[in-house]
């Protein structure tokens, strides 16, 4: 594991500045709460970025120096720059970890990476949620209790239009009867992706120790470490082999294709 993991927390930071009620829950923004809670872990270097920053705070320099990107978004999904979303996708394919929280299921980077609508059932009704750990030996479940109970949360329900997860770590039950795949792992290219469901902006979810533990575990799991990047495109043989073009004109050796 890397001695220090560079973590960037991206948050729209809109609800907290436009709603007094939500601003009272997260006076320093959702990103500020997550940063504060993660600061107890001494192996994280934490940076924050928000929608209103230039390039949404995700410049090439920031992205290239980010090991794991955490994303929380809701009301500005469509307004996020297509160019920035594509850059995030490419960085994940190149090895950067990506953690999508709650309504980030509908974010541009997440949908680009998963290739589906990522739509779901939902209801805002202050209902109880119980998040069950179904893979207790997985690194993301390390030091996490058998279940996490939230007295009030936004309800999500199946069907969740996502590809079948490579690994499913958590499943949620809601007071109104819905169930939901609430902790999903994916591999895309050289990068790892984790989706975690809890975290509606009206509730102090991100101040909880157990939620912070899940996020910290996901950072450690998703962090690229010791990746030997494969050589792609045309390569010379490792062993001595016959040259099928020997004696032919050099122009015959050239092929037009996407490298």
Language-model-detected regions and their locations in the chain:
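Aromatic-Pro/Gly-enriched surface loop or interdomain linker
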Residues: 1-65, 233-259
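Extracellular ligand-binding/catalytic regions of CAZymes and related secreted enzymes
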Residues: 2-4, 124, 188-194, 198-259
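Solvent-exposed loop/turn segments at secondary-structure junctions
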Residues: 13-15, 53, 75-78, 104-109, ...
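Short, solvent-exposed loop/turn elements at domain surfaces
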Residues: 15-19, 178, 204-205
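Catalytic beta-strand/loop cores that center a nucleophilic Ser/Cys/Thr
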Residues: 44-45, 64, 120-197, 232, ...
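Hydrophobic residues in well-ordered beta-strands that form the structural core
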Residues: 48, 100-101, 195
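Structural motif
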Residues: 68-72, 195
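A glycine-rich, often tryptophan-bearing local segment used as a flexible ligand/cofactor-contacting loop or short
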Residues: 76-143
């Amino acid at each position: 594991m890397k001695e220090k993991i560079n973590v960037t927390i991206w948050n729209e930071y809109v609800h907290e500045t436009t709603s007094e009620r939500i601003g009272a829950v997260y006076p320093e923004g959702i990103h500020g709460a997550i940063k504060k809670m993660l600061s107890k872990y001494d192996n994280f270097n934490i940076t924050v970025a928000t929608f209103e920053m230039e390039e949404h705070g995700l410049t090439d320099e920031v992205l290239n120096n980010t090991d794991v990107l955490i994303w929380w978004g809701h009301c500005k999904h469509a307004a996020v720059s297509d160019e920035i979303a594509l850059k995030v996708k490419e960085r994940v394919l190149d090895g950067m970890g990506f953690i999508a929280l709650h309504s980030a299921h509908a974010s541009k980077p997440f949908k680009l990476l998963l290739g589906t609508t990522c739509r779901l059932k939902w209801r805002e009704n202050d209902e109880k949620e119980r998040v069950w750990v179904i893979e207790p030996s997985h690194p993301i479940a390390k030091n996490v209790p058998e279940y996490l109970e939230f007295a009030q949360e936004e309800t999500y329900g199946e069907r969740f239009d996502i590809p079948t997860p490579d690994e499913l770590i958590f499943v949620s039950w809601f007071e109104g009867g819905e169930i939901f795949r609430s902790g999903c792992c994916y591999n895309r290219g050289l990068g790892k992706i984790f989706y975690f469901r809890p975290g509606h902006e009206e509730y102090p979810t991100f101040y909880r120790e157990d939620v912070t533990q899940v996020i910290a575990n996901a950072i450690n799991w998703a962090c690229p470490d010791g990746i030997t990047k494969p050589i792609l495109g045309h390569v010379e043989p490792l062993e001595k082999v016959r040259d099928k073009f020997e004696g032919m004109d050099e122009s015959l050796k050239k092929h037009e294709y996407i490298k």
